[in-house]
Amino acid sequence: MQTTFTELMQQLFLKLGLNHQVNENDVYTFTFEVDGHIQVLIACYHQQWVQLFSELGADLPTNDNLFGEHWPAHVQGRLDGKPILWSQQSLVGLDIDEMQAWLERFIDDIEQRKEPQNTKFQPNSTSPILFI
């Protein structure tokens, strides 16, 4: 028997112990603190496609990477003039463990994109640097 979107979300939030809100359109929202806060929205389009969304912030550069390292891809785009990260995959065959892994990769991707560009690599005296 195929799991419905509502059942999948109930199982996910129960397993992760996360507080969440759900609106009248079955959009699930949760916020968590990681050097600030990140809000993730989870929705289901036509009961076929599970979608993840998160607003990234106004100071991020445009990213043209349409295909990511992992499937499902995480796409950086714009919605109402604001940079967002979104991803989607089919509800068919999506189980709780796959949903959790996908959500964790999505959150990791958000954190990496929100990290200030000048702090991504800072060589120090112990960093091996090749001089030619």
UniProtKB/Swiss-Prot annotation:
What's the protein called, per UniProt? Chaperone protein SycT
> Is Transmembrane helix tagged as a keyword?
no
- InterPro entries noted in UniProt: Tir_chaperone
**Oligomeric state and partners?**
Binds to YopT.
- Keyword Repeat on this protein? no
| Keywords linked to the UniProt accession | Chaperone, Plasmid
Please give the function described in this protein's UniProt entry.
Functions as a specific chaperone for YopT.
One GO biological process term: protein secretion by the type III secretion system
* Source taxon at top rank: Bacteria
